[in-house]
Amino acid sequence: MRVVIQRVNFSQVKVNEEIVGKIGKGLNLLVAISTTDTEAEIDWIVRKCLDLRLFPDPDSNNNFWEKSVKDIDGELLIVSQFTLYGDCRKGRRPSFDNSASPEVAKQLYQLFVEKLKLSGLKVATGIFGAMMQVEIDNDGPVTFLLEKEANNK
């Protein structure tokens, strides 16, 4: 599983020019599911997304990486993006052999969303499988790639 985490001041996703998901301060999560992903990988990524200290403490000048999205009562925008598993090493067209099938990916993506909703934070999403326009006001910019493969500690 791969997730690009971006700390944002604002983010929204549109489908056919209609806003389907929108957040304020929090994290934008671009999510890809691989052929080997299971609930174990999802659980690990969920914990990381919620607990990573990616926000500054406004009361401290010394510790930029002090608060998690939970600590600041931030918001989450989750967008499926299978292209994170695109392999561009050969030829001129990306290969998506490592991406889960749409049926499997949708099921695991929905499980990921449901587990994040259990945090009590506001969670917004795009529409799985749709062509989307994502607007991201990246704060910092702060962007990280989380990756968890089966049997990868």
UniProtKB/Swiss-Prot annotation:
Record-listed E.C. numbers: 3.1.1.96
SUPFAM superfamilies: DTD-like
GO BP term (any one): D-amino acid catabolic process
CC terms in the record's Gene Ontology section: cytoplasm
Enzyme class: hydrolase
Domain of life: Bacteria
Record keyword Transmembrane present: no
Gene3D superfamilies from the UniProt entry: D-tyrosyl-tRNA(Tyr) deacylase
Subunit structure as annotated in this protein's UniProt entry: Homodimer.
Record text about domains: A Gly-cisPro motif from one monomer fits into the active site of the other monomer to allow specific chiral rejection of L-amino acids.
Name of the protein in its database record: D-aminoacyl-tRNA deacylase
